[in-house]
Amino acid sequence: MRITIFGTGYVGLVTGTCFAEVGNDVVCMDVDEDKIARLNKGEIPIYEPGLEELVQKNHKAGRLRFTTDPDEAVEHGAFQFIAVGTPPDEDGSADLKYVLAVARTIAERMDEYKVIIDKSTVPVGTADRVREQVETVLRERGADLPFDVVSNPEFLKEGAAVKDFMKPDRVIIGTDNPRTKELLRALYS
């Protein structure tokens, strides 16, 4: 399956690499040009046992690519994962500006059905805000395109993230669309 991951931090890099390891075609997108340049050389910005070898192996095999180009990223994946930071806001709540910015980026560029999947650590109700953002942009564009939004929180422990992803004790798929639920089940099977 063709997958795009927005964000190459801990969650995004582990998720993208592990999806590539099981045979998917993955593009990871980040705005940090230096980080993408290092990833394209096989150097990873975090320490996670086994991750660097998997990045190098899958990058060499062509199943894992890294880019700063949002056009390439949106065009590539039927599955668009949002795995960006949600730093604390002034009141301590999660600041969703990066999540909503990615939703806008996807909506501005999509030209076919997309499943937009939120992997970031976010509060309840964020999927509704992502959906509203995408609907607003599509309306501004005059585009009537189908899409679904899914909440798919991660449960990765540092030091065991690759193992946790490859053999999860649970996978949460939050969606109101049975078809989308089956697409995600197939992706994780």
Which residues does each predicted region cover?
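Structural/interface elements that position substrates and couple domains in central-metabolism enzymes
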Residues: 1-189
